[in-house]
């Protein structure tokens, strides 16, 4: 195998992600009144921000992880230790709506954004890969 062939195999499209945690409270206003999620409760949300693209031959990475963090910090400040229902656009803060909201906030800053994963418990979550 030639050196050029090895480089072509190594420098392909890849997806990377950075993991964040937020603590937040919410209630779901559109479920029946007797549903447990209609009551005020909180979660330790686990949020993954994924970006995908070609691996840069010089740096060896898709994107600097620090750039992902820098883009997410202002979003995290709006969510962490807040009542999500009070955040404009999150009046019905399901995991699905939260993932889409985060996408809309980050996509101008992260053009290679490929997926948002929101996990509200250790067994429940969703992933959003952007508008069709």
Language model features: what each stretch is:
Residues 2-132:
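Charge-rich, low-complexity N-terminal segments
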